[in-house]
Amino acid sequence: MKISIVMGFFLPVPPAAGGATEKTWHRLALEFAAAGHEVTVFSRRWPGFPDRETLSGVQHVRLRGCAHTPRLWRNLLHDFFWGWRVFRALPPADIVIVNCVALPAWLGALRPSAGRVVILAGRIPKGQFRCYRRIARILAPSTTVREKI
């Protein structure tokens, strides 16, 4: 199976600066690759990391990202442009796991070849799920998050 994993705009993978989501998906990507799946992870460019490399069977693609800010509107703007950069770079796959806000709003409709869209709702949603269409699966890490979706 071909699996793409899209991280947020502000941290790299493999994790070099924290990030529970980044650590979790990094470990899962390694497990998927060890099981014989073709895995591509998209994350932020980071000093000392090449833009493209393959580690333990996982292909890493690092794109221009931004630092996380204390302003929600600015983070949403960064996320929108991050989603657009990833959208243009995504290879054909069977599934694409998305860990950002804007990309799922248009990915399933505009690029079905990217794969069935799976979202991990790692935080309490703020209304973005109303904008999502053609989502194959939403993963909720807790009952509280599931009820808010």
PLM region descriptions:
Residues 89, 131-132:
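Structural alpha-helical scaffold elements that stabilize or flank donor/cofactor-binding regions
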Residues 79, 98-103, 121:
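Short His-centered aromatic/hydrophobic patch
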Residues 106-107, 127-129, 136-149:
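A short, active-site helix/loop in glycosyltransferases that binds the activated sugar's phosphate group
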Residues 1-18:
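Nucleotide-activated donor-dependent transferases that construct or modify glycoconjugates
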Residues 113-116, 135-136:
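A short helix->loop->beta-strand "cap" motif at the edges of active sites that frequently abuts
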Residues 9-13, 31-73:
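N-terminal strand-loop element at the rim of the active site
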Residues 19-32:
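Short amphipathic alpha-helix
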Residues 81-92:
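Short, well-structured alpha-helical segments in soluble
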